[in-house]
Amino acid sequence: MEIKDLQIFQKVVEYGSVSKAAKSLNYVQSYVTVRIQKLEEELQTELFHRSSRGMVLNSEGKTLLFYSQNIISMVDEMIKVVQDCDNPAGSLEIGTVETVNKLPSILSAYHKKYPKIDLSLITGVTEDLVDDVLNYKLDGAFVTGYYNHPQIIQYEVFEEELVLISNYDKLPFEELKNKPLLVFKQGCSYRAKLEGWVRDEGEINAKIMEFGTMETILGSVIAGLGITIIPKSTISLLEAEGVVRIYEIPEKYSKITTVFIHRADTFLTNALQKFIETIKNAPETARKL
C-alpha cells in the first residue's frame, strides 16, 4: 500500500466520483480506477457503494478514511519536521474571521521578518474555521467568541467591544431593534451575539438577512437596509465620516474576545512558532488560555 493510493482514495471520497477525483489530481480516469481497485484487493474488501449517482463509502471505507487521514497527517508532519530549519520557509495557511481589525499589522510584521514563508489567508465564520483547524485543513485561525476544546490550544489576542450600527439617525433606539438584522451565515459569533440579544428582548420580530462579506453588510447598513453589530474599532472611521450611527448594546452581548487557535497535537513548525511569536509581540499581547 502506498501513500499515493490513500491520497487518491481520499479524493474519490471527497468528490464521490472517480472522474472528478482524477480531474482534480490531473490523472487519467483509468489510473484512479486501477489504484482504487488495487487498494480494495490489498484490503480484501470493497470500500464503496457504487451506483450511477456516484460512489459512497461503506462501513469498511469509513474505517479506512479515518486511519488514512491520520496517516497522511503524520506523513505531512514528518516532512515538516525533517525540512524545518532556523530560517522558516514553506507554506502556512491561516484562517480568520473578516473583522480582525489588527490583523494587517500582524501579517505585515510577519512577512517582513520571514519573507520566505508563503502565507495564505482564508476567511470564514468561527464555526467553519474551528472545523478546518480540527480537520488539519488550516495550520491555525483567528476566531471569535470561542470556548475551550480538548484538541485545541488557543491564545487570547485581544478583547473588543461590539456595537450596533445603523444609518437611521433620526429613529429612536427602540425602533431600530425591529429593523432587519444583517448577518453572516450560522456559525458567526457576532451573529450569535446579535440574535441572543434580540431573542432576550422578547417582543422583537426582526427579519434575518444573510450576507457573504462584511463589505456587503456595511454597504447595506449605509444604504438603510438594516442594522448589524460589529467591533467598534472596525467602524470608527465610518462613524467619524457621519455615514453610520453607533449605539451601545448591553455589556452581556458587547464583549467579545479574538483568539488564535491551533491543534494541540500538531507539530509546531518554525513557521507556525514564529507566527505565534509575532502575535505575542503585537501591541495586544497574546496569552495562552
From Swiss-Prot:
It comes from the Bacteria. Keywords: DNA-binding, Repressor, Transcription, Transcription regulation. Residues 18-37 bind DNA. Residues 1-58 form the HTH lysR-type domain. The keyword Methyltransferase does not apply. One of its GO terms (molecular function) is transcription cis-regulatory region binding. Transmembrane segments: none annotated. InterPro entries: LysR_subst-bd (IPR005119), Tscrpt_reg_HTH_LysR (IPR000847), WH-like_DNA-bd_sf (IPR036388), WH_DNA-bd_sf (IPR036390). Coiled coil: none annotated. Pfam families: HTH_1 (PF00126), LysR_substrate (PF03466). Transcriptional repressor of soxA gene expression. Belongs to the LysR transcriptional regulatory family. This is HTH-type transcriptional regulator SoxR. It comes from Arthrobacter sp. (strain TE1826). The gene is soxR.
